[in-house]
Amino acid sequence: MRSSKVIHVVGCHAEGEVGDVIVGGVAPPPGETVWAQSRFVASDNTLRNFVLQEPRGGVFRHVNLLVPPKNKEAVAAWIIMEPEDTPPMSGSNSICVSTVLLDTGIVPMVEPETHMVLEAPGGLIEATAYCKNGKAERIRVKNHPSFADKLDAKLELEGYGTLTVDTAYGGDSFCIVDAHALGFSIKPDEAKDFADLGMKIVKAANQQLGFQHPTNKDWSHISFCQFAAPLTDDNGTPSGANAVAIRPGKIDRSPCGTGCSARMAVLHAKGILKVGDAFVGRSIIGSRFDCRVEAETSIGGRPAIVPSIMGRAFITHTAQLMVDPDDPWQTGYRLSDTWPVWKQD
């Protein structure tokens, strides 16, 4: 067996969304901050392509790289690699990272609760793990400040006419549309249609509405389309199913933590949720995040909320990713039969 590289990975998913974690074999990227390190990963693409492209990966996966924290308050930091983006934050990936840190002993577990400060590329988050018998059973993540950007905005979409949408930020940037108004029910057999239409909506939203984070000049686009079903009552708690289309054209299997945070920010801005209120986010496969509006805050002069999300993650495997020096496809490849071609016109 020959290999010029060995990367150690712990496989994990959070409520259905794959968020594997690199625990060894990769040196920290250059950069004075975790955000700068993530910009290097985003522009270089060598690591992302190696772990996400075939034959080692696929468009359905995310991979997280553990790095030493830059902020002394944090016990660990990580960089999120999605198929197309390297975002400031991810809810499902933060739950995967927290679970791997504790279940593998990288960070000592304290039962019944372990409190951690972690450093995402976009800043610090607080994670509380509810632990029993050596397992982190649930993780509650207090997310970055989240805010509504444009409410009830008009979006022209070819073949559909004028849509009424909301744009918001919940650790990443979203265009939120009414799933039922477009004829969807948030069911697994709609996933391909969600992915295809979602990418058209993302392109149109970037062209017509745009987005600029008030304090992060580098984040100046809308990443995702969230198809949101109308609110229902879940034993007295507002609940909303969703399907989030992720670039280049896949559907989040989890309820999407940043998407739930963005939707809560919109619901708060519209007076539907207040501080202390709970919200249940449900995914296209029926998994759930238990969410809450923790506090009101502001960011860059904008009203915002501090949301939290809670869910489960499960370790699926460990792996050593290798590369044979004679392999003609060492960096991997992608084909449009499974990996959609993304281009923002």
Swiss-Prot record:
Gene3D superfamilies: Diaminopimelate Epimerase, Chain A, domain 1 (3.10.310.10). It holds the Pfam family Pro_racemase. The active site is at S90 (proton acceptor). Transmembrane segments: none annotated. InterPro entries: Pro_racemase_fam. SUPFAM superfamilies: Diaminopimelate epimerase-like. It catalyses: trans-3-hydroxy-L-proline = 1-pyrroline-2-carboxylate + H2O. The keyword Kinase does not apply. One of its GO terms (molecular function) is 4-hydroxyproline epimerase activity. Keywords: Isomerase, Lyase. Its EC number is 4.2.1.77. Signal peptide: none annotated. Substrate binds at G91, S92, D252, G257, T258. It is an enzyme of class 4 (lyase). The keyword Cell membrane does not apply. Belongs to the proline racemase family. Catalyzes the dehydration of trans-3-hydroxy-L-proline (t3LHyp) to Delta(1)-pyrroline-2-carboxylate (Pyr2C). May be involved in a degradation pathway that converts t3LHyp to L-proline, which would allow S.novella to grow on t3LHyp as a sole carbon source. This is Trans-3-hydroxy-L-proline dehydratase.
